[in-house]
A protein has these predicted regions:
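NAD(P)+-binding Rossmann beta1-loop-alpha1 motif at the extreme N-terminus of oxidoreductases
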Residues: 1-59
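Residues at the starts of beta-strands that form the adenosine-phosphate
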Residues: 5, 28, 109, 136, ...
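Hydrophobic Val/Ile/Leu positions in short beta-strands of Rossmann-like dinucleotide-binding domains
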Residues: 7-8, 67, 139
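Short beta->alpha hinge that forms the Motif I/post-I loop of the SAM-binding pocket
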Residues: 34, 69, 93-95
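Internal alpha-helical scaffold of NAD(P)-dependent oxidoreductase catalytic cores
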Residues: 129-180
């Protein structure tokens, strides 16, 4: 990942784990979070090289942008942040895909995804560079196949296995499995 400038919006369990693993793999990582405590903890832990004051500033500084915000904040960001067309790749990690794909329809190099990994606790304090090791990471087919291929390579570098699945099918499977 050397030479990659990864922006991570949302420095909780998933975003923090992405940041930790990417830094360990040699990427430069810039973070944004509305909680200064999360940014301070991530910086102190060596997960971040720098921070950004907002999502627009983050998108302007990175080559790859991971949106690791809650679903409602992800949808709002996708619909209202024109700078998301600047990075070479933008991806999300929300647990629902169809609404995200719809909200991101104007973002050229966007790929919807969902790592099937987590913990009972959230927040940066629960983040772990090995969280995705051996786990499946769902990837919705993207209009930009080069962006999709790039995300699939990144997922492998984060330790996970990409699985391409249509957004609607992903949502149906997650809904069924959440009741088990």
């Amino acid at each position: 990942m050397k030479g990659t400038v990864l922006g991570v919006a949302g420095i909780g369990l998933i975003g923090g784990s992405i940041a930790l693993r990417a830094r360990a793999n040699g990427a430069t990582v810039i973070g944004f979070d509305r909680d200064p405590g999360a940014l301070n903890a991530a910086t102190a832990a060596g997960a971040l090289d720098a921070t950004a004051p907002d999502l627009t500033a983050l998108a302007e500084r990175c080559t790859i942008l991971a949106i690791a915000l809650p679903v409602d904040a992800t949808l709002a960001a996708l619909a209202s942040t024109p700078a998301l067309n600047l990075p070479e790749l933008v991806f999300d990690v929300a647990s629902v895909k169809a609404p995200v794909v719809h909200a991101a329809r104007t973002i050229e190099r966007f790929v919807a995804s969902h790592p099937l990994a987590g913990r009972e606790r959230g927040g940066f304090g629960a983040a772990d560079a090995a969280l995705f090791e051996g786990r499946t990471w769902a990837v919705a087919p993207a209009r930009d196949r080069a962006a999709q291929a790039r995300l699939e390579r990144l997922i492998g570098e984060l330790g996970a296995r990409p699985l391409v699945v249509a957004a609607d099918e992903h949502d149906r499977l997650v809904a069924v499995s959440s009741h088990l």
